[in-house]
């Protein structure tokens, strides 16, 4: 029986990707070697890295002004790395606080220099995206998080600003088209819509670097990795390889535009049931609901949770528990999630209603 995996991350990936990756663990590129034991300097892996970078550029229409990197350390390392590269000693970084990850990014910058929060939805447990805030055009940068997995909110329109725009797109990159030219830095951990944990995708505007005027540790300097083609040190070979396979799959299935249509269809199916069914309630403001992560509660948990959880288990639905900090339920619907899996969850919700 199929398991419907709604885990927030590490995420579901296409079965075709799993199949090819598993074969390459035994014999990669007909070398008689595993992909995880080949040299990262070999022609075979250099070709993988080159194709992965080319596919990122193709799918997101990355302009020539920007570089594409595959780094390590996760998005969490980017919190400090971006501050080292963009925050000057006498300048300031501005942050939109929409959840746990943006808050952590702000704290890293505040430990290095002048950082300030321009708006926050913490007062309402991060259940909406703030609007109508002012950004200082003279700030060193403005940072936002496009999608919030814990609270189920998503930025639908990015702010217009003269300040360099930086965004953590870890949980919704490649789920919709993005105008990369408007951003000085985009970063994303691979383990949502791209591949297994271990690689971090970075898209950085070359002309934005070298201006902070501070000492930058070698490994935290974007220019270090640009100059070496993401191979200053040994890259996360397997994660980059699987990410490349996922990007191939994405392109073969209509690209980012087609992914957006599928994601909106899946999200609409689930949110319509949440709104229709009197036993459930959504937690995020309707206008800010994420297409990637739908968060919801039972109206009467004491009366219905045990039954609903048993029904979910019987249907082989996995990973729908809400984040430990908020509870409830969370259905993560990344690119590789089939509509049939969302329909299976919706059927459970309808069955619960019929029981009571």
Language-model features, listed with the residues they occupy:
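A glycine-/small-polar-enriched, mobile loop at the entrance of the PLP active site in fold-type I
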Residues: 2-53
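PLP-dependent enzyme catalytic core of the Aspartate aminotransferase-like
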Residues: 3, 327-356
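Active-site phosphate-binding strand-loop segment of PLP-dependent enzymes
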Residues: 9, 109, 120-173
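Active-site C-terminal subdomain of aminotransferase-like
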Residues: 190-271, 285, 355-356
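Conserved PLP-anchoring active-site segment centered on the Schiff-base-forming lysine
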Residues: 88-101
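Conserved active-site segment immediately N-terminal to the catalytic lysine
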Residues: 166, 180-191
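Conserved N-terminal alpha-helix of the aminotransferase class I/II PLP-enzyme fold
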Residues: 32-78, 85, 99-100, 108
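Conserved PLP-binding catalytic core of the aspartate aminotransferase-like
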Residues: 280-311
